[in-house]
Amino acid sequence: LLGKVNPLEETLDFSVGEPKHPVPPFVKKEIAKYVDQLNRYPPNFGSEKLLESISSWLANRYEINSPSPDKNLVALNGSREGIFNATIALCNYKKGSEKPVILIPNPFYQCYLAAALAADAEPVFVPALPSNHFLPDFSKLPPKILNRTSILIICSPSNPQGAVADLNYWQSLLNLAELYGFKIFSDECYSEIYRDVKPVGLLQ
């Protein structure tokens, strides 16, 4: 439809969330050091050094006790893999005779919907609107939905709006999850994109 359109200014591509800048030189050098090892399979759960580094980073970033690399961490090929597999593994079918519900913010990352469908759950979309500061108000859902909820998925900072959940919002989600017995999947893949104040995370 836009094939014959000639924009007056440089266009910005918002279609896919991928880096638009070249790979930094120091990253290229670091990868080059290990190029001879790229023909091997890595450890399934991640190397000990990697998991220890992640544990240390989480402790410093969120000011928490260091998570156990053996019990609390697993290396993933991006958040998509983790969200999808965790949904399949942890979607609870024991809450009643009806299909379990997975709550999904709208707009949403396509992986959320794919995971819900693969788990044979009912996806329920909860709007992120200007009126709720682009953070879905899950508490307004009817009890009949919340009682069937197995997993709530939330993205903060959100995409595409950039809304950031504060401590009060996280606490309200935790209270709701405890009341209705569901799990929270917190997708914080944009947590390190900010100007001045670090976004608060669920681990805090």
Regions found by a protein language model. Give the residues of each.
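Metal-dependent active-site segment of extracytoplasmic phospho-/sulfohydrolases and closely related
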Residues: 181-183, 194
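Conserved core of the PLP fold type I
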Residues: 39-175, 192-204
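A conserved amphipathic alpha-helix that caps or lines the catalytic cleft of carbohydrate-
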Residues: 2-5, 177, 203
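Residue-level marker for buried hydrophobic side chains located in beta-strands
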Residues: 10, 184-185
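N-terminal "arm"/small-domain region of PLP-dependent enzymes with the aminotransferase-like
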Residues: 1-42
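Walker B catalytic acidic pair
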Residues: 188
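Helix C-cap/helix->beta junction micro-motif
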Residues: 8, 119, 179-180
